[in-house]
């Protein structure tokens, strides 16, 4: 019964934030913080209950906890929520970054506090819904629900970019990209349900029943492309990444933390949970194309990051590069690479959130994100430059951080399957060090390039230090002791991999 509350609490909390603004501007902040703290506590409670090592020999999903309530029985639509090791880890990450998103916007947001926190909470509620829903109609409902509050977050509280683009442009671009790709996925879901009805005479949107839908190879390939296009835009996969740099550079810090830390993960989760198991033969056929798109993403993201002058755009392009590794891992069919992808998703969520929070703190002090206006900041403020150095080396995959474990497992697992692609993508790690160190050099070293950068700047407050040090501790823990994460996700990932490999090697039921 905990599962519906994981989704309801952020929605109820968001509504309360909106309504209580009249009692004072600080009230919505505290309600939002308590709401996300409660969501995180509930998800940790589910984790402590255990039961994530369940496996069935057939590779059919095995859920630790399930909630099923009829919604529209005529079409087989129900409010069907379930959790296993993979979705649990994503929900915990959402809860954690939700708390940090509220904390990092504590001083940044001054107007419409209640409506801001309503949008923030509803995004997080929608994301948790995506991770828990296993009714395809409900999944699509939550998938689309995330978009509207994110649009408002960028359009109302965004910053003007250093190249003069407006926040409305960025918000509209984000909305059109994701809405259009979501529409393609809706058509694919409806087609899948119709194909299943033609074969069995039963209307259903239930994921477990749709897994056994008999269909021809051509139909399977078309439906798989429908799902892949929606996930590829959100991930993002080059060349469908056009919305990301603008949306990141104009969004408020909380929006960037949520998008890089959580929203991009919904796409990787969707590929693992839905695209591979529902369309195994088509996915296996499409795998070489997907993996080469991942390789292109790794290098394109790295080159574009190096060329940026806006520090937030630079970090946005690093996400394109890092998610390229995850895309390669997903299509290898290797258990080790899948486990690496899960670690990489969590580590990237933590390190990208850290970089965006530090960017926000830097912006509050010098009121620019243009690295051409920075320089020489290392000696001008305490803590912030050194912590930026930590997150920069974490991003480039330094041993001792979670990013290294994730990338190493992905490359090690992929090498057994696609050695050429693995060797080429390894060079992407070299470029990662180039853009990470270039960012540090331009912002913190050399001579001060503007009046603001040459002044003494205030250090970090306890709130700012707490957020960043928490992320540092978690990244180092993940780097030295990833075993709890691997144990939790092992069974769920094993089921997905087994179903995928068995369906490809045998004929589809």
What are these regions (language model features)?
Residues 50-78, 163-171, 182-241, 271, ...:
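Juxtamembrane/interfacial segments at transmembrane-helix boundaries in multi-pass membrane proteins
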Residues 238, 352-355, 422-456:
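Predominantly late transmembrane helices and immediately cytosolic-facing juxtamembrane segments
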Residues 14-19, 44, 102-103, 125-129, ...:
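Alpha-helical transmembrane segments of multipass membrane proteins
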Residues 15-22, 98-110, 152-166, 234-249, ...:
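C-terminal ends of transmembrane helices
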Residues 23-25, 118, 122, 126-215, ...:
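Alpha-helical multi-pass transmembrane bundles of energy-transducing inner-membrane proteins
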Residues 4-19, 34-46, 91-105, 123-124, ...:
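Central hydrophobic cores of alpha-helical transmembrane segments in multi-pass inner-membrane proteins
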